Amino acid sequence: MSLLTEVETYVLSIVPSGPLKAEIAQRLEDVFAGKNTDLEALMEWLKTRPILSPLTKGILGFVFTLTVPSERGLQRRRFVQNALNGNGDPNNMDRAVKLYRKLKREITFHGAKEIALSYSAGALASCMGLIYNRMGAVTTEVAFGLVCATCEQIADSQHRSHRQMVTTTNPLIRHENRMVLASTTAKAMEQMAGSSEQAAEAMEVASQARQMVQAMRAIGTHPSSSAGLKDDLLENLQAYQKRMGVQMQRFK
């Protein structure tokens, strides 16, 4: 796996799924391929994206700044600086300075990532902030190692949180989660179906499923009523899958 592929993988792992994730992936690919060289426009685009947390925007801004060639005097962006200040916690800043001194002696991506993984996400973000604000300089490889370590820490906590939700025994949370998944699946199928004539059946099934979820939420239903909702939806679309050759199993 190449260095840039690895960076792209780690960065995308902390971006929520959805159309915006596909857009960001495309931007990263363009930047890494040298196709997008307007850092100013890129940062303006990033700043106005919805859904993304300030920290995710800060990390993406840091990656874009590292990768896109720019004039020396180009001003640093406030939204990135604010995201990479370690929540203003002096402890994070102290640890970030110690980490920076270690990284300065490092020259490889994997070496930097290994060192950085023993620090908290707050300290890692602060260290990125030091480099972003030109208070310290490390090689691009080392900076990317720092980025990937930060993303790994964030993705780990997201995974723990997700696992807790999936394994929860609370029937209300499980009920809502099943309805959200069914609704999301229906939406994705509507998007994939597009405007072809054969897609009418799939669109109809997906639309009915979404209406059903809305009705269940509006009137309040027993937590067990959503059991198998998404699977039923997928089974109804098997005929469409065979005709269109679309791999609907991926949604399971």
Swiss-Prot record:
Pfam families: Flu_M1, Flu_M1_C. InterPro entries: Flu_matrix_M1, Flu_matrix_M1_C, Flu_matrix_M1_N, Flu_matrix_M1_N_sub1, Flu_matrix_M1_N_sub2, INFV_M1. It comes from the Viruses. SMART domains: Flu_M1_C. Its main location: virion. A motif (Nuclear localization signal) lies at residues 101-105. GO terms for cellular component: host cell nucleus; membrane; virion membrane. The keyword Magnesium does not apply. Residues 165-252 are annotated as: RNP-binding. It is found in: Virion membrane; Host nucleus. GO terms for molecular function: RNA binding; structural constituent of virion. It is a peripheral membrane protein. Homodimer and homomultimer. Interacts with NEP. Binds ribonucleocapsid by both interacting with genomic RNA and NP protein. May interact with HA and NA. Cannot bind NP without genomic RNA. Belongs to the influenza viruses Matrix protein M1 family. Most abundant protein in virion. When expressed alone can form virus-like particles in transfected cells. This is Matrix protein 1. It comes from Influenza A virus (strain A/Hong Kong/1/1968 H3N2). The gene is M.
